[in-house]
Amino acid sequence: MHGIGNDYVYVNCFEEQVEDPAALARIISDRHRGVGGDGLILIAPSQTADVRMRIFNADGSEAEMCGNGIRCVAKYTYEHKLAQAGGEFSVPGQRSFPASLNIETGNGILTVGLIIDDTDKVRKVCVNMGQPILSPQDIPVNLTGEKVVAQPINVLGRELLMTCVSMGNPHAVFFCDDVRSIELEKLGSAIENHNLFPNRINVHFVRIDKPVEFTMRTWERGSGITMACGTGACAVCVAAALNGRQERICTGHLPGGDLNLHWCEEDNCVYMTGPADEVFEGVWPEK
């Protein structure tokens, strides 16, 4: 399954048990010797929500949250009838969705609204991604102060200005004039592993196109360059507003597609809406 190109292998743990998910993630994510993907996501029963999701990056490390992944988990859960959808889900001051699910994540229980077509298929999912975390000690970043906004950082002999946000997982956002010319693999890896970030960090380079649109490229912690990062797009929405560069309701253009974002003043939560697609099902042989 994928959310605008951010592709993971999903395992239905209502039916299967995965003894070593970190090892499986490394093997199955290999695009030459495995299925190929940005990582592995387990969909499992939950004691406190409709389902529980666990995310493993391509290098086997476990992630707290995946914005594109949670939309795919919602689609799979509804269409494969792992749980019955609940009632209405509303975005304050915006629209309402007739069906909802609660999904347990490493960032707590998140509620999603489902856009369902006439064939009972989920076409889009809106996720309440929760409130952004801005304090450096909670992101975490080895800096002092209340926020990390337009903070200088030295990377490979260059001084860059970063804004850091956690959406349950850590993000460093850098604004630039041309995202295509950025040496993303070189800079992304260096920033991810910089000593300012005790848990490493996701890295995003962003161009502001209009007051309501931006274009971004991502280097994901543990996975490298990806087509999209949902939590990253939410972090960019927040970072752009904090820097006075953009409005709180905007559209993010990612290499894999677009996401609609809203950092709501009423409840301080970030709402993300986008598609989710199931590509194929298969059987992975035990080795």
Model-derived regions: residue spans:
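Ligand-binding beta-strand-loop-alpha-helix segment within the catalytic cores
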Residues: 133
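Short, solvent-exposed secondary-structure boundary/capping segments
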Residues: 120-129
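Extended Gly/Ser/Thr-rich low-complexity repeat segments
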Residues: 136-145, 281-286
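A glycine-rich beta-to-alpha transition motif near the start of alpha/beta enzyme domains, typified by
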Residues: 1-121, 172-287
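Membrane-interfacial helix-loop segments of redox and metal-homeostasis proteins
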Residues: 165-167, 189
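N-terminal, positively charged, Ser/Thr/Ala/Gly-biased leader segments
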Residues: 1-17, 127, 139, 144-165
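Selected transmembrane alpha-helices and immediately adjacent juxtamembrane segments
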Residues: 162, 170-173
